[in-house]
C-alpha cells in the first residue's frame, strides 16, 4: 500500500514544480509549429525583448527577397513575411508598399520577369499570387486567392511563372491568362538516387519540428497534440491539487460531496486515461529532442556520426510521394519538361515533366533555398554549401564569403548582389562575396514569432536557463512514465 502513495507524491510534486514551464513549452511549441500564421510573423514587439543571439535573425524577417531596377541601381524593392518596401536611394530610406484594401499578406517569394525590357514582379504570398507590372506600379491581385503559395519562379516561357501551392502542388500560370492554371500531375512519380542512410541529427531535427513522421500536415498535428497535452496535463494537475487543498482548508466554501467526487473523477479521466495516455508518444519524443536542442553543438556533433537506414524510418522518409515535400521549384528556359525542386533530400531534378525525379549529388541531403535570378540558378543550405549554375552549364560553381543561407540574388549591369539573413553581399569576382553597405529597412521592432522562440528556449530568462529547462523537461518525462503506472493501478 505504500508504493502507490509514494509514487503518487513523486508524480504530483514534480508536476507542480514543473507545471508552469511545461505549459509554456506546450503553447509556444504549438505557435512555432505554425509559421504560416500571419499574426505571429507580423505582430511586432520591442527589439529589447530579444537576446543578442536572436537579434542576428531579425534582418531576415524584414527583408528576404529583392528586386533592383535595371535602369536605376538605386531603386530597389524588397519583401518578406512582414511586407514590401521600396527605396530610391539604395537603402538609405525605405517606404512601405501597400496592398489593395489594406491587406497585408506574408510575402514568401518574388518571381522576376523581364518581358520586352519591362520588369514584372509576381509575389507568392499566404493569400495567393499578386503582381507588379513595373517596379513603380501598384500591387494587384493575380490568382489563387486564399491559397498559401510558398514558391513562385519564372517559368519556361517569357510570360509564365511556375510555383508551389502549400508545399504539395506544382503549377504553371501565364500572367496574361491568370485564370488558366495548369497543375502538374504528381500522383505517379518515381524518385531515384536517394541516400540509403539518414543521420540521426537530421531525423531528430525533423521529428521535433513536425516533419519527421508522416506528411507535413499530419506530423504537425501530432506535434500540436503533444503541446496541447502538455498544457492540459499541467492545468488539470494543478487544478486538482489546488481545489482539493482549498476545499480541505475552507470546508464552508467547498461544494457538496457528490459534486467534489464528480469533479475529481472528471478531471482525473481527462488528465490520465484520455490526454495522459494519448499524449505519451509525442510528449516523450518532443521532450527528449528538446533537451538535445538545448545543447545544439553537442547534439550536432553526436547526431551526425550516427546513420540510420532510410527504409527503417517513418513513412515520410521513404518518399513514395513528393507531395508536401516541395519547398521550392525552378524551371528552365524553353524546356517545359525540365524542373528542379528543393526537398529534405536536397535538389531533385526531372526532365520528363515530373514523372521521374533524380537527386542532384552535388549537395548533401539537406533542406535549402533554391531559386532563379536571371540566367542563374542558386542553391544554398545550412551546411554552408553555396552554389550557382548558369543556364546551359552542367557544373555547379561554389560561392564563397557568405556566412548564412542565401534567400535571393540580383544581377544589374556587371554586378551581382546576394541577400541573406545578415544583409546584402556584393560579388567581388569569381563568385566571391563581401558584405555591402546597403541596408534593409530599420523597423526598430521584432516579431512575436521570434519572441516565442526566446520563450521556448528559455533565452528570455537567461542564456544558461537551458539547464533549468532540461531539469523541468526530465521531470516531465518522469511524469509521463509514472502516470501510466498510476493509471494501471486505478484505471477509470
Show where each model-derived region lies.
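Hydrophobic secretory-pathway targeting helix
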Residues: 1-47, 277-295, 466-470
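Short beta-strand elements that form the blades of beta-propeller/WD-repeat-like
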Residues: 64-79, 118-124, 153, 158-173, ...
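Extracytoplasmic/periplasmic/luminal assembly and interaction segments
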Residues: 66-101, 329-361
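Short coil-to-beta transitions that initiate beta-strands within beta-rich domains
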Residues: 48-71, 98-116, 143-157, 316-334, ...
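Extended, hydrophilic extramembrane loops/domains of integral membrane proteins
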Residues: 130, 168-207, 241, 379-380, ...
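Juxtamembrane interface at the cytosolic side of transmembrane helices
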Residues: 2-18, 217-281, 464-492
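Alpha-helical transmembrane signal-anchor/signal-peptide segments
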Residues: 32-55, 292-317
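Conserved Ser/Thr-centered positions that define the repeating blades of beta-propeller domains
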Residues: 87-88, 131-134, 172-173, 350-351, ...
Amino acid at each position: 500500500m505504500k508504493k502507490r502513495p509514494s509514487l503518487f507524491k513523486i508524480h504530483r510534486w514534480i508536476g507542480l514544480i514543473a507545471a508552469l514551464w511545461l505549459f509554456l513549452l506546450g503553447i509556444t511549441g504549438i505557435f512555432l509549429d505554425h509559421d504560416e500564421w500571419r499574426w505571429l510573423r507580423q505582430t511586432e514587439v520591442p527589439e529589447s525583448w530579444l537576446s543578442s543571439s536572436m537579434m542576428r535573425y531579425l534582418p531576415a524577417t524584414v527583408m528576404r527577397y529583392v528586386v533592383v531596377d535595371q535602369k536605376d541601381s538605386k531603386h530597389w524593392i524588397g519583401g518578406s513575411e512582414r511586407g514590401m518596401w521600396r527605396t530610391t536611394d539604395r537603402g538609405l530610406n525605405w517606404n512601405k508598399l501597400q496592398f489593395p484594401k489594406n491587406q497585408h499578406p506574408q510575402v514568401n517569394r518574388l518571381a522576376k520577369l523581364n518581358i520586352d525590357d519591362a520588369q514584372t514582379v509576381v509575389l507568392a504570398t499566404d493569400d495567393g499570387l499578386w503582381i507588379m507590372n513595373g517596379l513603380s506600379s501598384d500591387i494587384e491581385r493575380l490568382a489563387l486567392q486564399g491559397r498559401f503559395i510558398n514558391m513562385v519562379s519564372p517559368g519556361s516561357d517569357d510570360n509564365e511563372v511556375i510555383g508551389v501551392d502549400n508545399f504539395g502542388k506544382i503549377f504553371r500560370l501565364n500572367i496574361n491568362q491568370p485564370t488558366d492554371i495548369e497543375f502538374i500531375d504528381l500522383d505517379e512519380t518515381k524518385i531515384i538516387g536517394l541516400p540509403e542512410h539518414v543521420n540521426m541529427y537530421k531525423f531528430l531535427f525533423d521529428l521535433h519540428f513536425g516533419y519527421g513522421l508522416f506528411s507535413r500536415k499530419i506530423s504537425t498535428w501530432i506535434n500540436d497534440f503533444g503541446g496541447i497535452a502538455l498544457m492540459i496535463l499541467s492545468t488539470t494537475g494543478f487544478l486538482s491539487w489546488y481545489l482539493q487543498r482549498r476545499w480541505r482548508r475552507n470546508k464552508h466554501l467547498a461544494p457538496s460531496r457528490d459534486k467534489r467526487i464528480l469533479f475529481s473523477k472528471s478531471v482525473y479521466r481527462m488528465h490520465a486515461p484520455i490526454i495522459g495516455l494519448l499524449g505519451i508518444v509525442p510528449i516523450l519524443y518532443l521532450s527528449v529532442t528538446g533537451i538535445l536542442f538545448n545543447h545544439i553543438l553537442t547534439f550536432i556533433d553526436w547526431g551526425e556520426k550516427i546513420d540510420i537506414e532510410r527504409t527503417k524510418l517513418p513513412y515520410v522518409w521513404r518518399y513514395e510521394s513528393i507531395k508536401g515535400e516541395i519547398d521550392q521549384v525552378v524551371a528552365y528556359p524553353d524546356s517545359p519538361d525540365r524542373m528542379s525542386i528543393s526537398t529534405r533530400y536536397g535538389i531533385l531534378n526531372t526532365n520528363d515533366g515530373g514523372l521521374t525525379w533524380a537527386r542532384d549529388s552535388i549537395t548533401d541531403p539537406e533542406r535549402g533555398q533554391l531559386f532563379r535570378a536571371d540566367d542563374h540558378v542558386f542553391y544554398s543550405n545550412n551546411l554552408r554549401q553555396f552554389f550557382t549554375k548558369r543556364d546551359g552549364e552542367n557544373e555547379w560553381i561554389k560561392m564563397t564569403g557568405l556566412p548564412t543561407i542565401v534567400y535571393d540574388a540580383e544581377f544589374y549591369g556587371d554586378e551581382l548582389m546576394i541577400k541573406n539573413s545578415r544583409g546584402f553581399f556584393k560579388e567581388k569576382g569569381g563568385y566571391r562575396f563581401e558584405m555591402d553597405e546597403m541596408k534593409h529597412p530599420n523597423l526598430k521592432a521584432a516579431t512575436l514569432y521570434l519572441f516565442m522562440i526566446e520563450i521556448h528556449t528559455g533565452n528570455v530568462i537567461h542564456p544558461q536557463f537551458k539547464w533549468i529547462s532540461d531539469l523541468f523537461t526530465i521531470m516531465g518525462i518522469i511524469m509521463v512514465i509514472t502516470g501510466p503506472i498510476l493509471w494501471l493501478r486505478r484505471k477509470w
